[in-house]
Design a protein with these regions (language model features):
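PLP-dependent aminotransferase class I/II
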Residues: 37, 49-53, 62-64, 71, ...
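Histidine-centered beta-alpha loop that forms part of the nucleotide-sugar donor binding/catalytic region
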Residues: 7, 21, 28, 54, ...
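Hydrophobic/aromatic ligand-binding patch that stacks against planar heteroaromatic rings
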Residues: 14-16, 68, 105, 155
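Glycine-/small-residue-rich active-site loops that bind phosphorylated ligands and cofactors
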Residues: 8, 31, 57, 272-273
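Short glycine-enriched loop/turn motifs at secondary-structure junctions
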Residues: 106-110, 199-202
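Conserved PLP-anchoring active-site segment centered on the Schiff-base-forming lysine
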Residues: 1-43, 221
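Active-site phosphate-binding strand-loop segment of PLP-dependent enzymes
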Residues: 30-108, 114-116, 121, 266
């Protein structure tokens, strides 16, 4: 068993199932992060790892989850696909997974990613499993029973080596846009809940919560005005149509998480967004709630 949050992209639970393990879904709070207490509540003698996700760019609770898991001698693997740039993360986990999908804060031209670790042994194993199980420096001599061909190709690596030089500026741009949302939407606190302002956030996305069940009507209103809001990962993991989801008989244990998710919307935020474009989004929200 591997403990995962119930609101992540399907790749999180798929990675667990790909190695023959079972994902155990954990509740979230309004930060959209797995609650640390869920590790103690859900862990059993079968628990082999905890896999928290830094969803939408927020990495709240990772250090607390790591402390709890370490006491129980359970490894922590952090899905930081949306959280590139938080350097302290690596000290709070055994493995850290990154994505360089073109839609991420730093993206290649296609599909690529990386695994980070402070453990030389885990690094050695990762390199072997990523290249057919071959021993390092000994092509066609297998050191593992199995492996994948999942090395980053040269084109993606070359692209990322250039984009890294622009990452800090892009990260500052995202922080500026997030700060402007917080400042210029603060007067709507009776209508929307803004994400917590923290330096432990890369602002991959900007999620808000609607206080009065107006998500669908705001979504439609904004679209009429030419502003595209979104709901990323609209179906929670335990609500799918696959056998793993339909096997969850105690849906009431997720009622609080479902309530939070049902109020979620994402505002536009990306590296190339101009302040004028952001002002239009802010104006649309004020027009709706006036």
């Amino acid at each position: 068993e591997v403990i995962v949050p119930l609101n992540s992209f399907a790749a999180t639970e798929n990675a667990v199932m790909a190695v023959g393990a079972v994902p155990v879904f954990a509740n979230i709070d309004s930060s959209f992060n797995m609650l640390p207490d869920e590790v103690d509540r859900l862990r059993t003698s079968k628990t082999k790892a905890v896999l928290p996700v830094c969803l939408y760019g927020s990495c709240m609770y990772i250090d607390a989850i790591h402390r709890i898991a370490r006491k129980a001698d359970i490894p922590v693997i952090v899905d930081a696909a949306q959280c590139f740039g938080i350097r302290s993360l690596i000290s709070h986990c055994d493995l850290l997974a990154l994505s360089f999908n073109p839609f991420k804060n730093i993206g290649s031209l296609g599909k690529s990613g990386a695994v980070l670790t402070l453990s030389p042994e885990l690094a050695r194993l990762a390199r072997q499993y990523s290249y057919h199980g071959f021993a390092e420096g000994k092509k066609n001599i297998k050191a593992q029973n199995w492996g994948l061909n999942s090395r980053m190709d040269n084109l993606q690596a070359a692209t990322l080596s250039v984009k890294l030089h622009h990452f800090e500026n892009n990260a500052k741009k995202r922080c500026l846009l997030a700060a402007r949302y917080h400042l210029l939407l603060s007067d709507l606190s009776h209508n929307i809940i803004l994400p917590t302002e923290t330096h432990q956030n890369t602002w991959h996305l900007f999620p808000i919560l609607l206080c009065k069940g107006e998500r669908d009507s705001l979504f439609a209103f904004a679209r009429e005005k030419g502003v595209e809001l979104d709901i990323y990962y609209p179906v929670l993991s335990h609500c799918g149509e696959h056998p793993l989801a339909t096997g969850y008989s105690r849906r009431e244990q997720f009622s609080d998480s479902e309530k939070i998710h049902s109020a979620l919307l994402h505002l536009p935020l990306h590296n190339h967004m101009s302040l004028q474009e952001q002002n239009i989004v802010i104006e649309v929200l004020h027009d709706y709630f006036k």
